[in-house]
């Protein structure tokens, strides 16, 4: 007993400290369009950005995956069906065929749709050009009652959604409110259980959405075009950490993390961000 205790005391404290890993407050990934020559005909490839397939997936609470399907000409992705999971598809590039239950629906660049639990769905490419689709998946806690799914998906194009300012944010950024909860009425699609907002932000030169935080939600930003500075966490000043960001930069923010964006302050500088936010369950209700 004494020898064992002595051996433990002789172990350097640094060795013991190395056993643990501190969870990140936010995550950054950078994505780029795939090389068309690297995509085999007839295939569907999934690239994880956050969540499933990413090494830091354990810190996500409600988001199960955020990534991109690359579907080659005449390719088709495997069908999915989740009992307690909802998804959003957003077509980044190309023309798609959405399989929803036993029906098919066309989708084109900048189309988006909501996919409820308990409905089989998949995406296919019937064209001769490459297809890229963002896929976002969210876990629905057992305490939430799930109703009957819509017989057909609602598909909306980004261009059909009006820009507007949002209370609490400066007029230097305009929003397109794409998707929200079933209890809402302001979004183009209001059918979600845990997704509180899926939205597009358009910043004028020098514009910002003013850094803020959400105490009970996690959020993802994807810079679609333009350049600026992402705000992530408190930084060295304890207020906001600012990091250069350009098209293809994606950020995941844990609950209560400071989040925001500053566009470049020069003539003609525009920036657009696609963002999604989902509420998290209380700590004692995690599934």
Indicate residue ranges for each PLM-predicted region.
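Short, conserved beta-strand element in jelly-roll/cupin
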Residues: 68-72, 81-98, 200-204, 215-230
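Extended, hydrophobic interaction surfaces within ordered domains
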Residues: 88, 96-146
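Short acidic-glycine-tyrosine-enriched beta hairpin
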Residues: 102-117, 235-255
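A short hydrophobic beta-strand segment most commonly corresponding to one strand
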Residues: 129-144, 220, 252, 267-284
């Amino acid at each position: 007993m004494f020898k064992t205790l002595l051996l433990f005391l002789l172990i350097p404290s640094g060795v013991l400290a190395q056993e643990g890993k501190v969870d990140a407050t936010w995550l950054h990934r950078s994505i780029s369009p795939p090389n068309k020559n690297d995509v085999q005909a007839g295939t569907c490839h999934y690239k994880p950005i956050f969540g499933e397939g990413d090494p830091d997936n354990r810190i996500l609470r409600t988001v199960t995956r955020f990534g991109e399907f690359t579907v080659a000409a005449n390719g088709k992705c495997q069908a999915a069906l989740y009992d307690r999971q909802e998804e959003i598809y957003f077509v980044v590039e190309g023309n798609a065929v959405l399989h929803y239950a036993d029906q098919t629906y066309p989708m084109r660049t900048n189309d988006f749709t909501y996919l409820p639990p308990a409905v089989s769905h998949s995406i296919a490419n019937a064209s001769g050009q490459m297809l890229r689709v963002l896929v976002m998946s969210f876990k629905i806690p057992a305490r939430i009652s799930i109703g009957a799914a819509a017989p057909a998906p609602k598909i909306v194009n980004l261009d059909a959604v009006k820009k507007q300012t949002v209370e609490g944010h400066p007029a230097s950024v305009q929003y397109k409110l794409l998707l929200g909860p079933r209890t809402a009425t302001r979004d183009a699609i209001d059918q979600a259980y845990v997704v509180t907002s899926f939205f597009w932000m358009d910043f004028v030169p020098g514009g910002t959405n003013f850094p803020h935080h959400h105490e009970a939600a996690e959020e993802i930003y994807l810079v679609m075009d333009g350049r600026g500075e992402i705000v992530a966490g408190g930084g060295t000043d304890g207020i906001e950490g600012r990091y250069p960001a350009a098209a293809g930069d994606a950020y995941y923010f844990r609950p209560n993390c400071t989040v925001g964006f500053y566009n470049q302050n020069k003539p003609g500088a525009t920036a657009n961000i696609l963002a999604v936010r989902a509420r998290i369950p209380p700590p004692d209700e995690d599934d």
